[in-house]
Curated annotation (Swiss-Prot):
<dbReference type="GO" id="GO:0015416">
    <property type="term" value="F:ABC-type phosphonate transporter activity"/>
</dbReference>
<comment type="similarity">
    <text>Belongs to the ABC transporter superfamily. Phosphonates importer (TC 3.A.1.9.1) family.</text>
</comment>
<dbReference type="GO" id="GO:0016887">
    <property type="term" value="F:ATP hydrolysis activity"/>
</dbReference>
<dbReference type="Pfam" id="PF00005">
    <property type="entry name" value="ABC_tran"/>
</dbReference>
<keyword id="KW-0813">Transport</keyword>
<protein>
    <recommendedName>
        <fullName>Phosphonates import ATP-binding protein PhnC</fullName>
        <ecNumber>7.3.2.2</ecNumber>
    </recommendedName>
</protein>
<dbReference type="InterPro" id="IPR050086">
    <property type="entry name" value="MetN_ABC_transporter-like"/>
</dbReference>
<keyword id="KW-0067">ATP-binding</keyword>
<dbReference type="GO" id="GO:0005524">
    <property type="term" value="F:ATP binding"/>
</dbReference>
<keyword id="KW-0918">Phosphonate transport</keyword>
<feature type="binding site">
    <location>
        <begin position="35"/>
        <end position="42"/>
    </location>
    <ligand>
        <name>ATP</name>
    </ligand>
</feature>
<keyword id="KW-0472">Membrane</keyword>
<keyword id="KW-1278">Translocase</keyword>
<keyword id="KW-0997">Cell inner membrane</keyword>
<dbReference type="InterPro" id="IPR017871">
    <property type="entry name" value="ABC_transporter-like_CS"/>
</dbReference>
<dbReference type="InterPro" id="IPR003593">
    <property type="entry name" value="AAA+_ATPase"/>
</dbReference>
<feature type="domain" description="ABC transporter">
    <location>
        <begin position="2"/>
        <end position="244"/>
    </location>
</feature>
Amino acid sequence: MLVFDKVNRVYPDGTQAVKNVSVHLEKGEFCVLLGPSGAGKSTLMNMVNGLVEPSSGEIILDGGVLNKKNLQLIQRSVSMIHQQLYLIPRLSVLHNVLTGILPTANFWTSLVKSFPVKDQQRAFELLSEVGLEEKHLMRRASALSGGQQQRVAIARAFMANPKVVLADEPVASLDPAMSRSVLNSLKHAAQTNGATVLCTLHQIDYALEFADRIVALREGEVFFDGHPSDMDEDIQKRLYEIEHETKEKMQKNHQKALEDSLSFELKIKAVA
């Protein structure tokens, strides 16, 4: 079980990115975090993987506290799928998946035959689970399509048998059909391997289709936590409104910054 217990995060500039978040996620649960940019989604993810410390409250995984004092627990239990893929282009698909065990191994990349047979078998199984055919195993990762590469990243994330997998906008650059295919692969891998998935998305329809649980955030606070079937039209409408309000606010702030910069340049030229 992954537990956020009254978690807060205040940055040095005084910005409170996360406000009193309490969420309990069960083993194997596929949880989607929804909310506009700046809602606190990334901060929550970064606290789980140890990059950011809670200002107060705790994040607990099966009784152990996740923080910088307990990095071994994080390294052993938490895996990450990034929006920006970090595959090694010149390595084969199989070898890229095998690198998923390297944080707990005593060697860097080597020939595939240097990995134990059981690890190679595990990689074969994971690639099959995410829908990559055997013919792709020895191809270079750089030769694959974007959706295929994301499947490789998913398989790699499960290689070390993590308890928690964090997925940061895993379908941001994919078309709708491929996005659904990749999310289906991610959910299937999570169910098969018994891992809890915490996934950030911007698309409400994907969350409603694939999530076991949706947690929606606004300005660091949870305003919805429940099953997709509990997210009625009023809540969905409010979420769209929040997204629109946030975009307008960001655009205004950007415009003001440009105007301030231009004003400063004109003052400098006037003095000169």
